[in-house]
Structure formats: structure tokens, C-alpha cells
Amino acid sequence: MKKIKVLCVDDSALVRGLMTEIINSHPDMEVVATAPDPLVARELIKKHNPDVLTLDVEMPRMDGLDFLEKLMRLRPMPVVMVSSLTERGGEITLRALELGAIDFVTKPKLGIRDGLIEYSEVIADKIRAASRARLRAPAPAGHAAPLRLRSPFASSEKLVIVGASTGGTEAIREVLQPLPADSPAILITQHMPAGFTRSFAQRLDALCAVTVREASDGERVLPGHVYLAPGGETHMRLGRSGANYVIGLQASEPVNRHRPSVDVLFHSAAEAAGGNAIGVILTGMGKDGAAGLLAMKRAGARTMAQDEASCVVFGMPREAIALGAADEVMPLADISERILTRLGDRGHRV
């Protein structure tokens, strides 16, 4: 079996050693070299031609973002960012994903050894996914505003429910940016750690006509608003309070190894919204969301899955399609317009 060749770039000798230990403990991958900074890494990339690069965000001589930008322009390859679990780390990591990084892992603030070892399987899964991922062009600087679509109508009864993982931050941006300000409410679960989703919501809010915010427990769901599940600590559910939809955040065990889980959101939407919802599953590894999307379909919702050609990682959509959970499969570029078309359809299903 051909092993996945990994180059680890980090200014911390401790982190380089731990990443090497973790990666080499898996039989399908190996660290072929490590580098303390991007300038050394540049020569090692030429020498070893790695399949995946793990790249620290903040380093001396040249920071990770500058190096990533040059790398994706001159020699594109799958990159997994290694970021500190801080608000600043979150903002930098989101920019790295815009520049073309496939995914990221977080370094704990304290107890780095125990923290990284604890996430050994997650790190290995992300490297495997990156090795198979489709590279995409970096997002243009400033994100030129797309042509806004027209909403067929705004109704407090209609909802769009979205789930995503690896590659999802850019996919979500592409879905939301064309939507008009009077779009129905949208609830999104994107796999992210605590502290990152607020920065993500703020970035989206600055780019979109709809209002994007990190969801709060108990808040009423309003048209023209997008609610992003807070990362890491709770699951987001859709519920009812009289005639209104409300958001519930629940601190319970991970589902499908994730918290927040897409399945939890989708199952709650099936129960609370039934045929008034549209369910959308986007790029991501694993199977989270597949069973929940099927539950939404059985409850009367219209359901959509991103197609293989436009996914960074065709995992979650593949599982949903295999279950028969998706009414339609389409390229990412078509999803926004299709959502609004479905919202304008008459009948018992959205």
C-alpha cells in the first residue's frame, strides 16, 4: 500500500515531534520531512514532493498565510493548517481556507502533547481527506459581490437547513452570497471548534445581503437571517414556540464524532418544520447529516446534495445520495438559485 507522504511545517520542535509521532502511528501515512519555517519547507517540497502539507499559521521568517498564498499560486497542493485555539487563530485560519487550504486542526492553549495525542484520529482523518481532496482556486481578494438573486417571496414558515464539513466554509459563502436580504431563515451546522464560528459568522455577515450571526439558545428564527451553530460545545436544534421557530442549543455528547452535528439539526428540522423546509448537504468527510437528510425528506422537505465534481471532499453528500436522501444532486454554483426556485414552488412540499 502506497503511504500518504506528509511534510510538517511548524516552528515548535515539540509540535513537529508530536505530529510525526501521530502520523507515523498510522500505517497508511508517513512524515517524509519536517521544517521549522516556510523557507526550509520550500526546499523540502522540491526534494520530497509530499502528498499533504501540515502548516503552522504563525511562524518566524515568513508566516503561514504568506507562504500558503505563494504555494497555492505557484505549486498548489493539499494543505492542512495547524492553528492556535484563539479568536485571532480562528480569523487567520478562515483566511487560510479562503486561500485554498483544505482543512485545519487546532493546537490547545495548554497541554499541547495531551491535546494533540487526544485528536490523533481526527488529525489522521483530515490528512487522509486532504490527500484525496480536490484543489480549488483561492477565493478572490475582497470577494467581488455576485449578482444577487431575487426571492420569490419571504415567509416566516419557510426555512433552509444546511450542513457541511471539510471545504464547507467556502461552499457556504458561495451559497449565501447570491441570496437576497429577504430570503427565508437559514440554519447552518458547519463542523468547527469553539471560538471559530463567531469569526466565521462575522466574515459572512460582511459579505452577504442576509444577516449572519452565531446562533444563541432560545432565540426566535427570523426571515433574512442566517444562524450558524456555535462550534465545539453544543448541538443546534430547531424547535417551535407557538407559531414561531426557535433555536435550541444543547450540551450533549458528540454525534457521529461531531459537536455540533449536522444529523442533530436535520432530525430536529424534520420534526419541527416538515415540508416547510429545504435540506442541503454540502462538501465534507464522513456520514454526518446523511440520515438526518433522509428524515427531512420523509417528513416532506425538499432535499439537495452537492455533486462530486464541485465538492472538496465527497463524503457526506455521497452517503446521503447512497441512502436515497437527496431529491436533487447539483453543482455548488447552482444551489442558491435552486433553493429560491424551490421556495417559489407551490404544493405541499417546499
From Swiss-Prot:
It is found in: Cytoplasm. GO terms for molecular function: phosphorelay response regulator activity; protein-glutamate methylesterase activity; protein-glutamine glutaminase activity. Disulfide bonds: none annotated. It is an enzyme of class 3 (hydrolase). It catalyses: [protein]-L-glutamate 5-O-methyl ester + H2O = L-glutamyl-[protein] + methanol + H(+); L-glutaminyl-[protein] + H2O = L-glutamyl-[protein] + NH4(+). InterPro entries: CheB-like, CheB_C, CheY-like_superfamily, Sig_transdc_resp-reg_Me-estase, Sig_transdc_resp-reg_receiver. The active site is at residues 165, 191, 288. One of its GO terms (biological process) is chemotaxis. Keywords: Chemotaxis, Cytoplasm, Hydrolase, Phosphoprotein. Residues 5-122 form the Response regulatory domain. Residues 152-346 form the CheB-type methylesterase domain. This is Protein-glutamate methylesterase/protein-glutamine glutaminase. It comes from Bordetella parapertussis (strain 12822 / ATCC BAA-587 / NCTC 13253). The lineage of its organism: Bacteria, Pseudomonadati, Pseudomonadota, Betaproteobacteria, Burkholderiales. The gene is cheB.
